[in-house]
Amino acid sequence: MNLVPTVIEQTNRGERAYDIYSRLLKDRIILLGSGIDDNVSNSIVAQLLFLEAEDPDKDISLYINSPGGSITAGMAIYDTMNFIKPNVSTICIGMAASMGAFLLTAGEKGKRFALPNSEIMIHQPLGGTQGQATDIEIHAKRIIDIKRRMNEIMAEKTGQPIEVIERDTERDNFMTADQSVEYGLIDKILERK
């Protein structure tokens, strides 16, 4: 059972109850706190678009604690982050792995953060298929193209040469917050708000 906390806010018109995510959204904070699938992606994209409509000149904060997930769902979030006018600041809390790490690094340069005990993990895309040999070949080519594109984006965002990204994403590559700053995945470790 997934319990969502409720907060009570006093206004001049009385009390108002919000689920915690709606209250955070009021402060332009979005939480990605799960694996990334189509439903999660659609929710994050909708929140980004809503906040842009509310104020296109004010930053949005995306807090990430995610093991990763679907590439296409994650790319929908990535593309929306780049499509909208507001800068999207990313903050790793806990773990940003796989597509979670990709989205963390996709935040606005200079506004990509992690808390001190956060862990970031990068690797190559995972996938699998079955069927006729020709279909398997089609899917294999597709995942190789996705890997190349994601490595190019990661190289651009981190400042690392593409060869370094290719080598370092060959297997699961775990980094501390400090190592992530050195690598260019994030810009700074946040100690206090």
UniProtKB/Swiss-Prot annotation:
InterPro entries: ClpP, ClpP/crotonase-like_dom_sf, ClpP/TepA, ClpP_His_AS, ClpP_Ser_AS
Domain of life: Bacteria
Active site: 98, 123
Function: Cleaves peptides in various proteins in a process that requires ATP hydrolysis. Has a chymotrypsin-like activity. Plays a major role in the degradation of misfolded proteins. ClpXP is involved in the complete degradation of the Site-2 clipped anti-sigma-W factor RsiW. This results in the release of SigW and the transcription activation of the genes under the control of the sigma-W factor.
Signal peptide as annotated in the record: none
Keyword Protease listed: yes
Catalytic activity: Hydrolysis of proteins to small peptides in the presence of ATP and magnesium. alpha-casein is the usual test substrate. In the absence of ATP, only oligopeptides shorter than five residues are hydrolyzed (such as succinyl-Leu-Tyr-|-NHMec, and Leu-Tyr-Leu-|-Tyr-Trp, in which cleavage of the -Tyr-|-Leu- and -Tyr-|-Trp bonds also occurs)
Gene transcribed to yield this protein: clpP
Protein name from the UniProt record: ATP-dependent Clp protease proteolytic subunit
Regions that span the bilayer: none
PANTHER family according to UniProt: ATP-DEPENDENT CLP PROTEASE PROTEOLYTIC SUBUNIT
